[in-house]
Amino acid sequence: MKNQNNTPIAEEVIHNNPTGYGLFAGIGDNFNSAAQAICELADDAISNLRANSDDPDLSMTVVLSFEDLGDAVEICVVDGGTGIADLGSALTIACRDGAQTPLNEHGFGLKHALASCDSSPDQRWSIRTRTKADAAAEQYREVTAPYTMGTSEEDQPMKVFFYPGAGGLPYQTGTAITVRCPMAKFQTVKPDRKAAQSDFHHLVKYVIEELRYIYAGVLADTNITMKVVEISGGTEKCHVLKPLQPTWEDGTMKRLENVPYDLGGGQLTIHCRYGNILPTKSNAIYYKGNMTSSGVELRINGRAIEHGPVSYTHLTLPTKIV
């Protein structure tokens, strides 16, 4: 039935602006593992370093620290990159102004990671950053929780605070993102096996294996260094990450190198290796020679984006596959 009367007699504004807490609560529980949120934070750091790899003033280092707080874990990701020039854009949902590589091109990763670690009303996170302009002014900038959007009296805009000095940042420029993750959520990094140990040390080991696997190509083929610092009981232990790569059965591995191809999103260079791998018993998750850790492994510029027994019917990628 059509409405024949097209002349309204009145109108009113619909007030449907989201609140920051409502947004975080809505997007905060979509990951199966806290490791996915950790990788979102690492993606931003690596993206910045790769996009500015020709800058001799940068430190090509990403340090991830995990501190045992008992009922929670403090996660901190520090890089020696350029710093974040526009924190407003970085904290705006779907804003792509700061996109530098495919690792941070969608404008959701930082917010999604923070919300996934802690979307509670008393969320705790902070972003400290220092650009070359900040360093010249002998200052750093900081934004702290909660996440707000300035949409109501109860949801006031976030503020950037300027402080003198370097704010504990270990490099001339760079960014430190710190977020509290409840221990129950951090324990999701544990493999889904009854025998898998769940004490803090082993949880950090699972995260290390995840990082070594996800960023194997980055660690093997770029000058970026990644470290994990494990903090528990007042002691610190530093782990320098090495790429986690398969051990091939002799004579089975084949290569297809430097194959140009356009899958519909632009020209790519495809590198492919395939064959039989030997199980690595020391691994908790990857390259164990079982069904779960076998199948297809897909990487973009060295970063794993898919693995396991999957099939692809359509794939559009805008960048180089390594």
Question: What residue ranges belong to the model's regions?
Answer:
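GHKL/Bergerat-fold ATPase module in large chromosome/replication-associated machines
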Residues: 223-315
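Bergerat-fold GHKL ATPase/HATPase_c domain
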Residues: 1-61, 66, 86-91
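Short, highly conserved beta-strand within the GHKL-type HATPase_c fold
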Residues: 71-76
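Glycine-rich, histidine-containing beta strand-loop boundary motifs that form or position
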Residues: 41, 79, 128-131
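Glycine-rich/acidic phosphate-handling loop/turn and adjacent ATP-lid/helix
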Residues: 78-100
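Single conserved hydrophobic/aromatic residue that forms the stacking wall/gate
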Residues: 314, 319-322
